[in-house]
Every structure is written in structure tokens, then in C-alpha cells.
Amino acid sequence: MERSRSFPTGEEIDLKAITIGAYVSLLEILQMAKDGKSIDEILAWAKEEIDHFACYFFVDDLRFFAHSGRVSHFSGFMGNLIGIKPIIQINDEGKMDSIGKVTGRKNALKALVKYVEDLGDDIKNHPFVLGDTDAPELANIVERMLREKFGDDLKIVRCYCNPTAGSHSGPDGVGVAFHAKHR
């Protein structure tokens, strides 16, 4: 009890994101703190900018969505059979939305890069997070595609998605999180 009195009251920031979507915002906030910004400056920035961090990823195996009830077992089986890869975004409320489907991993990787190309805003001056669920070789391909498109000076931070996210999406998924015009 005595120790809690020595700390100032906290402020909450709803990052409206999970995993890599939250990570990219936190990297920006940490840099602001390192640069000596006050808590009020950081909070004001967050209120304006949090909705300008987008997160998109694809799921490779629909069985995991079937297990969690996001799709029926039949849909998951059929989707896997024909190679459907849903593209998922974290929406303005911080919830996952399926925003499209492609067939095959190659098209899924291209779709992620296309979202960055279409929605990215000043991405070279902000952190860029590339995450995967036990798929470093796929993340390497996306990183190469991004560097070809945006140059080697793109500040890409690589990470593995946490086990909780991985248990819902399964292995072999890749996601991108970046500063965007909108989510």
C-alpha cells in the first residue's frame, strides 16, 4: 500500500490492437519516452495516432479457426482443401475482421505487401513490425518483397507472435503492422 502512493496515478491507452499491432504502437511510444516526451505529450499523440496503426495478417490453416469457432469445421476443411488463406485485419475497435480471401501462400504474401503499399503512411519514419507464427521463411519472403518495394532503409522489426495468438491462428501465418492512412 505504501509503495503504491509513491507512483503517480496511471493513464490508460487503448491500443485497439493485439500482438504485432500493439507492438508497433508501443515501439513508437517507447521512442517518444526515450526522446524525453512528457506523459501528456505521449497521451495526446496516442489519442490522435493510435487509429493510424494498421495490422494485417493471413492464416495458413483454417483448422485453428474451426477449433475456436470462427469458421465451421466443414468450411475449414473445404478451405484448406482448396488453399484458401483469409486475410485478417484488426479493425477500429481492436477486433479481428476477415477482409478478404486469397488462394495460396504466395498470393497471401503479395496481399500483405499490397495492403502496406495502399495504406502505408510515412512508413519509413515509423516502426514497421513483421511477425510470424513459426514461419520465419515466409516472413523472410515478405521482408524481401517489402525491401524491394520500399527500400532497405525501411525500419523492419521482426518478431514471433505470442503463443496465445498462435494457438488461435496456427503455424505458418505472417502479419504486418505499420503506420497507415487508416486501419
Predicted regions and their residues:
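Mixed-charge interfacial surface used for oligomerization/domain docking
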Residues: 1-11, 17-183
